[in-house]
Design a protein with these regions (language model features):
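Cofactor-/ligand-binding subdomain signature composed of acidic, glycine-rich
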Residues: 1-37, 116, 144-146, 155, ...
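Glycine-rich phosphate-binding loops that contact phosphosugars or nucleotide phosphates
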Residues: 34-159
Length: 159
């Protein structure tokens, strides 16, 4: 069996683990935002995680009524621009938690006073250290750059 097929078959178990383990943290976030609602939500991701962000954009706008946009990380990394994310919720999605572009968006967002959330598979990753709140996907590790199966639990995390 290929690694990708193995990852795909493990998605239901990973999803169940994520929901069971992260439910209290997500409920805490919901309560926090009921008191102080962000004006907009920014999602930052690269590669297959960007697919999860695109799907999440639809779900979050429908569920919250808050405008959601995808960040363009190269605005920071290539052009050194400053973007004001004050009053925003900025969510970075990275399977490894080591995407330089995604992490830079999260760092800049924190500097602006945004509330930051990281969605990752790695509890000890750079992303997990930067984010104020972390949601662990708990999927099998993704090897190399091919991605594929690892994005499924990220997509479902949004539901």
């Amino acid at each position: 069996m290929s690694k990708m097929l193995e990852e795909i078959r493990q998605q239901p178990v990973a999803l169940e683990r994520t929901f069971r383990s992260e439910l209290k943290g997500v409920e805490k976030l919901r309560a926090l935002f009921a008191k102080s609602r962000p004006k907009f939500i920014i999602l930052a991701a690269r590669g297959t995680s960007d697919n999860a962000a695109q799907f999440g954009r639809y779900l979050l706008e429908i569920a919250t009524g808050i405008p959601v946009s995808l960040a363009a990380p190269s605005i920071f990394t290539l052009y050194g621009a400053r973007v004001d994310y004050k009053d925003a919720l900025v969510v970075a999605i990275s399977q490894s938690g080591e995407s330089t572009d995604t992490n830079m968006v999260l760092e800049r967002a924190r500097e602006c006073g945004a509330f930051t959330v990281g969605i990752t598979n790695e509890a000890s990753s750079t992303l997990a250290k930067i984010a104020e709140h972390v949601i662990l996907v708990r999927a099998v590790p993704v090897y190399g750059k091919r991605g594929g199966g690892g994005a499924g639990p990220e997509l479902r995390e949004r539901v």
